[in-house]
Amino acid sequence: MGGSADLSKALIEIATPESRSPRQVVCYELANERLLQEALASNHPVDQWSLIKSNSDAYGHTLGQHESYDMRVAQGPLLIAWWIGLILLLLPLLLYRVVASIWLGSMLLLSLGIRKIEGIRTTSKTPQPRVDDLHSADCLLGFPMAPWQWSLAASGLRRLHAPIVWLFGLLLNAVALRPHRKKASAFFASRCLLDGAGHLDSDARFWVSARAALVDKQIGFGSYNQHRPIFRCDSLLRKLLASPYWSLNQYASLFNPIQRIEIAIGDSGLCQQSQWLRIGATALVLDWVEQTDDPNTIQLKSVSEATREFARDWMLIRSVPDRFGTDFRAREISRVYLRSIKSWLDKRPDAPREAWEIIELWQMTLNQIDSIPKNQGQPPMLLVGRIDWISKLWLIQQLDENTVWSVKKKIDIRYHELSDQGYYQQLLDKLQLSPLITDREIDKAMRVPPSDSPAWRRGNLIRELSDAQSSLVVGWESASYELEGQAYVARFLR
């Protein structure tokens, strides 16, 4: 497991270890929630502090969950085109690294010069604690820099690598993930039906999914240019621009046909059924895309527009056109994919048992969604406590029609509270539903990483070297450490 925290924004991000099955992912997600709850309870009064597994913050930023899958970037002629594109990018990449090194060096000299001048001015005075020390300033190569200097350095780098990012974006759009975009985009447009967490906007309108409602591209970069693509390729961009500048190892890894790609349209939910359907159905669709040549797929006229439409359609009545003018509703699209994958699995005698369990759960969920009363006034009660957006909508609909927005918004927020007082947990206690993941599985996941994944090797390395004077630095793909003056690098292959 990994994580990060920005205490200035009260934001904690936590990640599951690499896993081999959808059930395993959900199990470690639930283990993460319990670990956070235990950490909070042991350090802060539970009546004064709480954790919210939210999809937005007080500043209006949309958060949600990012899922990472190993996908084949391209194959056949498209893979050759991908390689050629990467080779053509090498010269501008090297030029960028040279110019960027000069730029960072000049920023470092500027910082040292300013500090030297300030030091001369204060030699005749009694030394006073400085504000721009390591506790309040960022560092470049270990040297402290004032915030304005760091901002200037970062702004310059962004302008220097902007042409490379633009060229790499063209390569992605032209070559990368073509089968996935063609055959799976309609599924992702409708997926919020299964895994949306619900959202109440500032006008008291209820959305199925906050994250999916902001999708504006099929493929691209998210953090770099503030786009909200379905296929988020920021990890590839980081490899292209990765430091240290004298090494091309990360660049060379882009030639591998299998890359880690993020799907960035999912909400942060709590229902086990929602989470298992999200990961399980997505994994099946991606495998189906890469292993079949089925031409009978839905190709929507505008994928991003359809995704936004379905994300705001809690009554499940909106339809969107495909390229041939045929209209589809979200539940109809989901059924088409369900039938296609079920037919594909029928031809595979080696299909794992979990695949069929996901198919059964998927089909049951769609059948229960279809049981919505004709007046469209209430969500299906059978899915309350099992699908997040339906559960939250049901809670809000129990209020009087004249209830003020702030009371409804309180339900929207406290539904995600990770405590016994959270509204989801209270709902679960009331309904007494049988969990899909047992407490025994979750307890084990809190202590032991998956035995057949890089997380196992990473965890063993941390345990062995955490007490030694090894200067251990651990990342997702590799770790570096020193023993008896000898430097070592361990790589965690997936």
What kind of feature is each model-predicted range?
Residues P17, S21-L86, I117-M145:
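Gly/Pro-rich turn-and-neighbor structural signature
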Residues G76-L177:
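Long intrinsically disordered, low-complexity regions that are acidic and Ser/Thr-rich
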Residues M1-I52, H61, L86-R97, S111, ...:
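Terminal catalytic/cofactor-binding subdomain
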